[in-house]
Amino acid sequence: MEVENKLNRMTAAGLLIAIGIVYGDIGTSPLYVMKSVIAGNGGINTVGRDLIIGTISLILWTVTLLTTVQTVIIALRATNHGEGGIFALYALIRKKAAWLVWPALIGGAAILADGTLTPAVTVTSAIEGLKGLEFGKGNVPVSNQTTVLVITIVILLVLFSIQRMGTRIIGKAFGPIMLVWFAFLGVMGLINIGGNWWILQALNPYYAIKLLFSPYNKAGFAILGSIFLATTGAEALYSDVGHVGKGNIIGSWPFVFVCLSLNYFGQGVWILNNTNMHSATEINPFYAMIPENIRLASIVLATLAAIIASQALITGSFTLVAESINLKFLPRMNILYPSDERGQIYIPAVNKMLGITTIALVLFFRTSAHMEAAYGLSITISMLTTTILLYEWLVLKQGHNLANLLFVIFFSTINILFMGSSLSKFTHGGYVSLLITLLIASVMVVWYFGNKVRDQNVAGNAYVRLDEYTDMLTNLSHDDNYPTYSDNLVYMANVKYNKFIKREILYSILDKRPKRARAYWFVTVNVTNEPFTAEYAVNTFGTKNVINIQLYLGFKKQTSVNVYLRQIVHDLIKDNTIEAQPQEYTTTPGRDVGDFKFVIVNDVISPSTTLSSYKKWLVKARVQLQNLSLNPAQWFGLEFADMVIERVPLILGKQEPERIKRVAPVDYSKASLNKK
């Protein structure tokens, strides 16, 4: 309750932070929305008053319905301990029905796909404003698209390279910069409106509906694909509620909406006053309506806004992946914390994939106009899936009623219309967005359902009580019939409730070739919410050589298990919890600790598994993903330790070994090797 009250609170500082973090994507939409509409209708010299008024009406009512109503008014109510976003929403309702995992997986994959497209299209659109701009007398340094691409790629390379340092310092400038940006949008819009208040007819939704069926609209319903670009970024208002608070989003949105609306009004008036321009499709009304003496400053400001929008998407992608890992949608990855706040994270693997994909998209599409064809489709998918999950949440809270039914029908219809119009651009680049979404969704499906199949079909008991095997381990430790495998045999094992351990761990010690050791260590690493926690707890089960260690490490601490364990051993020997391990041959006089061997146990599917081909493939693919996702030596800080990775059979399904029939040996008593 205290968390909810804090998030509902609105403060001046909170409003500024919200403007800097939440609205980057939707705030850069004026850079390309009207340009895309004009290009789709044949160029500026072919448009008329009905088209412009209808277009602006469509933009305003799309933003009103999808951003203001669906997101700000409805979605912000569905928070999970103050956190928002599609995965937080899914976590609230996942027990309601098993099928809800599908819209969550697909929607999450679509948002991650958008994380590659947003930096590409926003930065390219901003830099394209430099093309043809004179610096001094007749000096045009950016005269072609190749130069635009070079500048764009350099900016993106710098942006992705600095992610490891976090955004704590530069993030403080986001709010003031975006505040200036939105004020600039509003002022430029007002200046270009002048006395042409007839443009306010666009506030009437009649003109929006009329345009869809008007002969002046050469694009037909496909125009919605361009219109939808005005609301991309609406999902950020929901996903970032945990960072900035519900009250600050609700309080700052009216200012942002007014500034955006004024700019679209201004662009509309400027277009109708300049329909005699010779350029058919290349003109960008956003830059064209800005006075030449401040155009360079506007490009710098637009570039900063584009970078902030991209930064917000990158940071959001890190958060989304971390949530996916917690929900077992994605395999474990190396997560770093550049600051002392756990909310600020950096995932090297995700950063690398985002950077490579984004730059590849820039090189592939080359212009922002081509990128716009791919942009938007993935977001229509995420909005539709969020609508489905929101409906289930409303039913969970309020039960089945007419209002909830009308909500899902109305907003699903709108989202499907936008998705259909975006699909009309499929062959022009939309397929790229869909391919990225499908690729990410495929990884999630394999990991989630592979885990599910494995957990449902593990033969026998997956976990056993460690305390039931302590006598056997103690006897093996003193059994001279077996050579000593190591003084200290350490298994990185997730011991649950301080006593339950995976059967495969004990299988590795006892069933393969019995591994004799002076001491058996079972280490569990627990990451805490505090940044610098460094604690451990010990349970020896009443023995001197079977030790369960629970490590509690802060999220900023390195997982250096090798270093921590040596200190723990010395502590336990000192207080006589375990026996000393004096060494006869050593370069360190008085050394009383022996050698360590660390064991990581990986699963391989046993040939005895009786699952269907599809389920067997799922589990195999899941194992491959686990092997590719993170090097266990790096994760546990064992790069310089004596470590082995063992494979143990994973037996799934019913055990029905094939019986082979015994027959009498063939009688060769009369056979001869001599040929006659």
From Swiss-Prot:
It holds the Pfam family K_trans. It is found in: Cell membrane. The chain crosses the membrane at residues 14-34, 56-76, 97-117, 142-162, 173-193, 219-239, 252-272, 296-316, 345-365, 376-396, 402-422, 429-449. The keyword Transmembrane helix applies. It is a multi-pass membrane protein. GO terms for molecular function: potassium ion transmembrane transporter activity; symporter activity. GO terms for cellular component: plasma membrane. Belongs to the HAK/KUP transporter (TC 2.A.72) family. This is Probable potassium transport system protein Kup. The lineage of its organism: Bacteria, Bacillati, Bacillota, Bacilli, Lactobacillales.
